[in-house]
Amino acid sequence: GSKGALLMRSKFTGIPGNASGTMHQDDFIANVQYRLKRRIDVSEVPSVRTRVFLPPVAEWEKRSGPHFGFRLALETTALIEKEIGFLKLKRKEMGNEIYWPGMFIEFESKADSRSRTDDYAYLRVRSNQRGADFRGPQITTTGWWTMGISVTPDGMVHYYASPGVEDLTEEDYITSQFPYGYEAERMRTFFYNICSADEGRRWSTSFIVDDPKVFLVRPKGKQM
């Protein structure tokens, strides 16, 4: 059984107390690098797994778009824009780039469309090599799901998901990508997104997360 599940929902996902009427997200960050006092090299083959409870569809926010996200914060060396000198002139040079691949629970609400007769949900993957999100598996059941993301020494990101709370296997594999064309070098942390319409009246969909774990195949130094 659970020893510390966390229910997450939000109403003002932009500026607290100031509704914008535009979809925003709140982030719940695990801050793995602060607990370990270091970042995780991809040679250690990190992976993160979490359980997430999806409520009955009738309890979801009546809004099409992303409702929940499970993502990593990764680092690579890439061409980035920097401000140089007193005049803060901008130029591009090689530097440390942080990016955030992951999976979103996407909802297509029949309340938003006259032609849509049913609600529909699926996983949206971030991202392909060009930086574009793409559609993953359809979500055909609510309740508990298990989601996982791993990074291999070649810098590739691998995505897994399955209904239920069983450990993930090869059968739960979705895709492998170099998001944005980047080859990951280090992992900083993982985090969750809670999204809402940010209109100050409706709460976001309530999701429960439980049992998040970070695994290293070849850990360096001190054991986790």
Residue spans of the language-model regions?
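Low-complexity, Ser/Thr/Pro/Gly-rich disordered linker/stalk regions
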Residues: 1-129, 135-137, 155, 171-224
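Localized edge beta-strand/strand-to-loop motifs within extracellular or lumenal beta-rich domains
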Residues: 140-164
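Beta-rich nucleic-acid/ligand-interaction surfaces
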Residues: 165-171
